């Protein structure tokens, strides 16, 4: 199998924040077979969401035959799904529960581990636009499968990844939980969003990539080959 050609068919995306127009434009231009998305997808099915210019966003992602798999971030409507369960929330759009896995056609296994703490919690209303379920729990860690994992898709990142220096976003309990994931699986690749900045590194043999958000540069890239 030509792994380089195959990976051209799989995209990894940073935060979407319900900007489904940018998502559809990208997919219609590039026609990926599979999309892996790193949380803050913008799953607010009961909300009418506006973009930064005050224009009403598309309420449903329209992605044709592409299959999209996303983990939850800290900005989703947790009243409309369970963080540890996998479900098809729109046609060809799958929420991947914490600890769920996806087998790629090249034989690699992807683990999804969403969740992160909201630094804007003080400006949000519990049960309306903020939910305590955003945090990764010990129960989530207990449910992790005993399988080989090649790639992790998460929203935030393990504490070991040097993504930001002395910033309020750079440390939360979810990062400590993801450190457990890193130690348990020793994946070769890890992708995440949350910080709205682009950065790459390698820690404990794991090549990691932080992606930005829809509408910005470096908000997506092709999945790295083996």
PLM features: residue spans?
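Catalytic cores of nucleotide-sugar-dependent glycosyltransferases that transfer UDP/GDP/TDP-activated
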Residues: 13-16, 126-136, 161, 166, ...
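Active-site-proximal loop/helix segment associated with metal-binding centers of metalloenzymes
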Residues: 108-168
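Core catalytic region of metal-dependent phosphoesterases/phosphodiesterases
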Residues: 13, 18-105, 211
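Binuclear metal-dependent phosphoesterase catalytic core
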Residues: 4-6, 101-106, 180-184, 196-226
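Active-site-proximal segments of metal-dependent phosphoesterases and phosphodiesterases across multiple
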Residues: 42-57, 148-185
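Structural motif
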Residues: 9-10, 34, 108-109, 150-151, ...
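Active-site environment of divalent metal-dependent phosphoester hydrolases
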Residues: 17-24, 42-47, 71-82, 102-103, ...
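A short helix->loop->beta-strand "cap" motif at the edges of active sites that frequently abuts
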Residues: 64-68, 185-188, 206
